Design a protein with these regions (language model features):
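Single conserved hydrophobic/aromatic residue that forms the stacking wall/gate
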Residues: 1-11
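Short cytosolic juxtamembrane segments of multi-pass membrane proteins
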Residues: 3, 187-206
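Transmembrane alpha-helices
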Residues: 9-17, 106-138, 185
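Residue-level signature of the transmembrane alpha-helical core
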Residues: 12, 35-39, 54, 67-72, ...
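Generic hydrophobic transmembrane alpha-helix motif, especially the helices
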Residues: 13-18, 26-89
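Hydrophobic alpha-helical transmembrane segments of polytopic membrane proteins
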Residues: 14, 52-57, 67, 141, ...
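Amphipathic cytosolic juxtamembrane alpha-helices at the membrane-cytosol interface
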Residues: 29-33, 37, 90-91, 95-123
Length: 206
């Protein structure tokens, strides 16, 4: 179960790096914001599956390679969401007041911006975490993910394909497990968004 714990850790890591960079760019603006976002746009234009195939061909298919790489590619969209949420917040009067009182950017981020954008970032991160789980299993199904004896639903589905004619349940069981987990995460994230009053239909394009 080491890889499953790693996928849980990478959820926090993608929130940390994506949220931090997005908040920073949204606050400072200017040329730094433009340069960083153009770099993010360039990475977003690259199909994740092609990038992952290149990475595993160069660095291997260990969880130490797969999990951080997936966390990076699925965390890029959080940068845009955090940046858009920060733009909405910095126009508020309490941000103007904090700047007038001489608060540093770090103080404004920690005390004023983060509490107001945290929920949107967490909801987006949960949705992307479910996509990352699907991506991880897809790589294993194609033979570019983890190898036995590491347990993985994509690997189980791939190994059981030859049993479809007489033992279809060997394929259906991991499909059901993976689907249930992904749907459960998405439904939980949607419920969380509704409870917090977050309209995901108007979030920043990613």
């Amino acid at each position: 179960r080491q890889w499953s714990r790693g996928l849980g850790d990478v959820y926090k890591r993608q929130l940390l790096w994506g949220g931090s960079l997005g908040i920073f760019c949204g606050l400072v603006g200017g040329k730094i914001d433009d340069v960083v976002m153009r770099i993010i746009d360039a990475f977003l234009s690259i199909p994740w599956i092609l990038a992952m195939l290149l990475i595993v061909s160069l660095l291997g298919t260990t969880t130490l390679v797969l999990i951080p790489a997936l966390g990076f590619f699925y965390g890029k969209g959080i940068v845009r969401v955090a940046r858009a949420a920060t733009h909405d917040v910095i126009a508020k009067d309490f941000i103007v007041s904090a700047r007038a009182r001489g608060h540093s950017n770090m103080s404004i981020i920690w005390n004023e911006i983060l509490p107001n954008v945290r929920d949107a970032i967490m909801v987006e991160g949960a949705m992307r975490w479910s996509w990352m789980l699907l991506g991880f299993s897809s790589l294993s199904f194609l033979g570019f993910g983890v190898s036995p004896p590491t347990p993985d639903w994509g690997l189980m589905i791939s190994n059981a394909r030859g049993l479809m004619s007489f033992a279809y349940w060997a394929v259906l069981a991991p499909i059901f497990g993976l689907s249930s987990l992904i749907i459960g995460i998405n439904l939980t994230a949607d419920a969380f968004a509704k409870a917090l009053g977050i309209d995901r239909s108007t979030k920043a394009p990613v």
